[in-house]
Amino acid sequence: MSSHKESSEYEMQYRSTIQPRTAVRSQSRQSGNYVSGGNGAGSGGRVLKMVTEMGSATVGGISPALSANAAKSFLEATDKEKKTLQGLNDRLGNYIDRVKKLEEQNRKLVADLDELRGKWGKDTSEIKIKYSESLSTARKDIDDAARRKAEVDVKVARHRDDLAEYRSRYEDIQQRRESDREKISQWTNAIADAQSEVEMLRARFKQLTDEEKRVTADNSRIWEELQKARSDLDDETIGRIDFQNQVQTLMEELEFLRRVHEQEVKELQALLAQAPADTREFFKNELALAIRDIKDEYDIIAKQGKQDMESWYKLKVSEVQGSANRANMESTYQRDEVKRMRDNIGDLRGKLGDLENKNSLLEKEVQNLNYQLTDDQRQYEAALNDRDATLRRMREECQTLVAELQALLDTKQMLDAEIAIYRKMLEGEETRVGLTQMVEQAVKTHSLQQQENTDSTRSVRGEVSTKTTFQRSAKGNVTISECDPNGKFIKLENSHRNKDENVGEHKIRRKLDGRREIVYSIPANVVIKPGKNLTIYARDQGGINNPPESLVFDGENTWGIGANVVTSLVNKDGEERATHTQKTIQSGQ
């Protein structure tokens, strides 16, 4: 009974202290249980149980801090396991010494021991054969791990080359995009210059049109003045003719008066001939004086009238001629000016047509360039999305391979520890009676435990592994890039490279495990810049209200946590624009 108690003190369980990692691999291994001691209830026993479990790694990138913590935890766990194995080896040595002491007290079992000695070689060979297969399997696993590591290195090198190629294509696309922008800027400036020139020509055309209207009005006015001058000339000509007629009438009247005067003179001469000589002489002298005076008077009147008529006629003729000359000169100048303006208008219309054609061609070219730029941007964004998807897939594959390699290394370490224990048990201890009993009893107990679960061993309690998956989708440029697992914040991202996105009056709906729903309305006029994020914190979670970078949801102190969480972004029309789904699955072994 005492030996059973003492042996039960050595009964212990070995577990890997490495924490479960989600979404990669789960592997467990349990070594054989060894119980050594006498037969019956009083015999001692020892159970050695080793369980190595690896959870699955969460899909996503492994941060450097997490890798450093994992490496540190792994080293601490390895040191602890080494110390535990050293303690087990020391206890095994003590146990062997105790077996030696028990051999002296169990001389009565010499016959049974002799019988067992006959079976030593067979059992030892079976053990060697059995563990030789395990060693071969372990070596094969190590070789497979090395081969997989080489494959991973090859894939990583290929992915690096792909990444360099994508980076080169990205830089090429950026250069072409900058070149297209410069061309668009140049063409835009050329269009602006052409438009300004067109506007200037239109203003000049309008000015020439106004000047043509003014010249036409002046021409009409001068033509009216010319017609008026011609009418005045006709009137003056008629007046001159009237005056000439009056002069002719006066001349005829003068001739008539002269004839009358001559007749009177003849009559007076006749009377004078009949009168005395003195009287005749007197009247003759008087009559001569009177005739001379009348003649002089009529000569002066006729000469003055003639001079007045000639001077007035010459004045009117000169005025009419001057008006006609001025009208002709102005008419000629206006005709020349109108002709020149018509030529200028024709030239300007031709230039305007050419500029309009050139402007239409430039506008078409700008439109084609805009279409090409849009296509290039779409192809560039598609290439970026493909690159991101490839990088995520490569990262996931690398994480999977790293986890598998870590699992193989853990398995190798565990097998090395077991091999060291078995080697210590087999080398140099086969000649000892107590060790032979222990090995035989261990083999018997191991074969028995493979068939049924006895009361002499304790059941291994399974460890829980957690697997969390995230799924995102979006119908536009705004996506729900991140939801904090602890419900602190929700992050929106504008994935477009050069377009603002207005998320004002949008709503965020977060449904927890299909029961509770949290709704938050984004304030109006909140715009997310291209490539930027908008983080919406719950109340008292360390956020500040600084739109458009961050907002604070005062209605709740947490966004909530759960096993099945669906977060969606709904616009003002009630249309769902983006979703983020988080599912957590727990499994035990």
Curated annotation (Swiss-Prot):
Q: Where in the cell is it found?
A: Cytoplasm
Which InterPro entries has this protein been placed in? IF_conserved (IPR018039), IF_rod_dom (IPR039008), Intermed_filament_ifa/ifb (IPR016451), Lamin_tail_dom (IPR001322), Lamin_tail_dom_sf (IPR036415)
Q: Where is this region: Linker 1?
A: 117-130
Where do the segments described as Tail lie? 434-588
Q: Where is this region: Coil 1A?
A: 85-116
The yes or no answer to whether the keyword Secreted is present is no
Which SUPFAM superfamilies has this protein been placed in?
A: Intermediate filament protein, coiled coil region, Lamin A/C globular tail domain
Record-level Gene Ontology MF annotations: structural constituent of cytoskeleton
* Domain IF rod stretches: 81-433
Free-text tissue specificity from the UniProt record: Expressed in epidermal cells. Expressed in amphid sensory neurons, the excretory cells, the vulva, the uterus, the rectum and some neurons of the tail. Isoform a and isoform b display a similar pattern of expression. Isoform a is predominant in pharyngeal tonofilaments.
Choose any GO biological process term that the UniProt entry carries and state it. nuclear migration
Please give the knockout or disruption phenotype noted for this protein.
RNAi-mediated knockdown results in 79% embryonic lethality and 19% larval lethality. Abnormal localization of epidermal structural protein pat-12 during embryogenesis.
Naming one, the record's GO cellular component terms include: intermediate filament
UniProt KW keywords: Coiled coil, Cytoplasm, Intermediate filament
**What role does it play?**
Cytoplasmic intermediate filaments provide mechanical strength to cells. Essential protein, involved in attachment structures in epidermal cells that connect muscles to the external cuticle. Required in morphogenesis and epidermal integrity. Probable component of embryonic epidermal attachment structures. Functions in larval muscle attachment independently of ifa-2.
PANTHER family, per the entry: INTERMEDIATE FILAMENT PROTEIN IFB-1 (PTHR45721:SF6), LAMIN DM0-RELATED (PTHR45721)
Name under which the protein is recorded: Intermediate filament protein ifb-1
- Species: Caenorhabditis elegans
The gene designation is ifb-1
